[in-house]
Amino acid sequence: MTKLILTTMELCGNKCHACAIEEEGQIMELRLEAAARQSILGNIYVGQVENIASNIQAAFVLIAPGVRGYFPLQEAEQVIYASGKAPGSPLRPGDQILVQVSRDAMKGKLPALTANLNFTGKYLVLTTGEKKFGLSGKLSGSERHTLSGWLEAEAARPDKEYGLIVRTNAAQAEKAEILQELSYLKSLYEKVAVNGKSRTCFSLLYETEPVYLTTLRDIYSENLTDIVTDDPEIFQQITSYLKETSPEEESKARFYQDKLLPLYKLSRMENALDEVQKEKIWLNSGG
């Protein structure tokens, strides 16, 4: 039995989202993320080319007023224009393009941007830059054969404007689950990459999912028996997510309510954190 526990707790004076994966009453994995997220990694924007630096083969693209990112010119042919220009046209200052943040700003470096938009699901990844069909190298020969057969019609479509990568997780899924997720990712692509062409400059077209949704996405549904949270906002988001992506899983979500015993205390998350902090690794040198 695998239970997913999603809650909010204080850590070092900061409010955090905490996700615990519990098996047979024991926390096996704990993921934390600041509730006030600073990262923009994975976000997709309508950016505007500020200038082009041919000497370093890069363009500097504004994704918000005063916020610029580094865009490699070798991806210029993959650009989806929001300014009405035809695909494959030369990139010019002032052009409005769809970009995804591939690396956060760090140590004085600008955030890195890419034209290859990625939409990641539990079993599949849909991409706009590489319009090929691929499978994870970790899949066995028989798994690759089965999954290729299930997605043969989609892979053979000559008119598709995106690529598809089959993740290792897909080996655990039924055909209906794979096709249901494909439908969801295609609708997300349509909403962001197609409809985004008509959005105004600096629009945020897609925001990376918080840790509690990515954790939920990555857990195999066949092993997951219970999803519990005591945070109303998290509960609303996970039920909406399940309704859209896996309606058959929605009944597993439940809301815990006890003001005297918060969920993080009931599930002993503080103890799990203490255990992690106490762990020591003994080196050969004795340090």
Predicted features by range, described:
Residues 1-287:
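DE-rich acidic low-complexity regions and acidic surface loops
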